[in-house]
């Protein structure tokens, strides 16, 4: 009887230990994800990281503010796709933006801003037409099948998964990231009116 109880105790202990190790590994993995995403690109000490949805009204209002802040402070902006499931054309718009990224990142970002500028008129039926107008204006071909191999969708999905991994709850989500203060590598900007003040504070650290 004692042997049986001992074996039961050992089994439970082993199970708890295994679960603890799995939990620790998951936490470490999540922290690694945060550390890899919320950091400036090589060569920069401070940057703005944005997770956005091209159909999101607040994202439309935030994008030009972020762009102006980038120019004012001469710091880069890193844009991530986070299309929300409740929006009926934002995912395809993100895939289209990724296509223009293949020509140049600047062109892809210009397309994102173009979609924001026309967001109120864009819908699932005319999104392609807006893409064609943009492509023609920039003398770029827009294939009939934009993502034949699925590579562009995979990039959008990877960005969305990154957002989920760092527990994103809304769009836009804007971070000021920095290498200047290891104890506080990123700060979320929760109000657009605080964007410049947050950058100032991070740059002073």
Residue map of PLM features:
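C-terminal cap of thioredoxin/glutaredoxin-like
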Residues: 132-205
């Amino acid at each position: 009887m004692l042997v049986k109880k001992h074996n039961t105790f050992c089994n439970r202990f082993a199970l708890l230990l295994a679960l603890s190790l799995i939990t620790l590994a998951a936490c470490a993995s999540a922290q690694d994800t945060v550390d890899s995403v919320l950091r400036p690109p090589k060569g920069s000490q401070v940057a703005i990281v944005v997770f956005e949805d091209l159909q999101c009204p607040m994202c439309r209002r935030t994008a030009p503010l972020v762009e102006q802040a980038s120019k004012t402070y001469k710091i880069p902006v890193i844009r991530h796709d986070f299309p929300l499931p409740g929006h009926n054309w934002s995912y395809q718009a993100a895939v289209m933006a990724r296509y223009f990224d293949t020509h140049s990142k600047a062109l892809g970002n210009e397309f994102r801003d173009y979609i924001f500028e026309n967001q109120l008129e864009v819908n699932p039926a005319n999104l392609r037409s807006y893409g064609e107008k943009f492509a023609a204006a920039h003398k770029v071909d827009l294939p009939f099948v934009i993502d034949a191999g699925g590579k562009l969708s995979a990039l959008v999905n990877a960005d969305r998964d990154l957002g989920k991994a760092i527990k994103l709850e809304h769009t836009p989500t804007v971070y000021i990231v920095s290498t200047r203060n290891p104890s506080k590598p990123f700060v979320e900007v929760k109000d657009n009116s605080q964007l410049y003040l947050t950058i100032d504070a991070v740059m002073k650290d």
